[in-house]
Amino acid sequence: MLALINRILEWFKSIFWKEEMELTLVGLQFSGKTTFVNVIASGQFAEDMIPTVGFNMRKITRGNVTIKVWDIGGQPRFRSMWERYCRGVNAIVYMVDAADLDKLEASRNELHSLLDKPQLAGIPVLVLGNKRDLPGALDETGLIERMNLSSIQDREICCYSISCKEKDNIDITLQWLIQHSKSQSR
């Protein structure tokens, strides 16, 4: 009976109460940022993704939550834009190619450099280790260690190992994002 009442309450909330959140998606080139946006928006995976030049903005609705996603290019010439697009968002999603171990140091340095910016203090960060379906890809424990995530103490930080191709852990990623649309009012 209680479950039925909860479902009815959720249904009423979905009709009368809409949530909006804004997030910025950053990370090195070829980590899978645009692919991630396409997977959460449409459920579709495409092998032949064109690298983002500059930025793309996309609105995605899941239930009663509309997520405005800023997908920022990861090439070196666009990294100076990351801070500007991260200001005032509900969350920063940092994408890592968990199978490209040669780029992990550069990725770690870029993440820590970004999070050192005073204007971004306190904004929650979700680190996604993409391409877990590839051989040698790091899991969450490996990512936390190699990206030195435990040293980040001034904000909430979460890390998931995902595969956009296989759609692994996309559901828990969306749950985290939706939870942060409700807990943050920026």
UniProtKB/Swiss-Prot annotation:
CDD domains reported in the protein's UniProt record: Arl10_like (cd04159)
GO molecular function: alpha-tubulin binding; beta-tubulin binding; GDP binding; GTP binding; GTPase activity
GO CC, any one term: lysosomal membrane
Intramembrane region positions: 1-19
Effect of deleting the gene: Lethal from late larval stages. In garland cells, results in defective late endosome-lysosome fusion and inability to form a rapidly exchanging terminal lysosomal network. In motor neurons, results in defective anterograde axonal long-range transport of lysosome-related vesicles which leads to defective protein localization to presynaptic active zone and synaptic vesicles. Fully mature presynaptic vesicles containing synaptic vesicle proteins (e.g. VGlut) and presynaptic active zone proteins (e.g. brp/Bruchpilot) accumulate in the soma of motor neurons.
Subcellular location: Lysosome membrane; Synapse; Cell projection, Axon; Perikaryon
GO BP terms: anterograde axonal transport; autophagosome-lysosome fusion; axonal transport; cell division; late endosome to lysosome transport; lysosome localization; neurotransmitter secretion; presynapse assembly
Signal peptide residues on this chain, from the entry's feature table: none
Listed result of changing residue 75 to L: Probably constitutively active (GTP-locked form). Does not affect interaction with CG11448
Tissues showing expression: Expressed throughout development, from embryo to adult stage, in different tissues such as larval motor neurons, salivary glands, testis and ovaries (at protein level).
Residue sites binding GTP per the record: 29-35, 71-75, 130-133
Family: Belongs to the small GTPase superfamily. Arf family.
NCBIfam families assigned to the protein according to its UniProt record, in alphabetical order: small_GTP
Subunit and partners: Interacts with tubulin. Interacts (in GTP-bound form) with Rilpl. Interacts with unc-104.
Name of this protein: ADP-ribosylation factor-like protein 8
Organism of derivation: Drosophila melanogaster
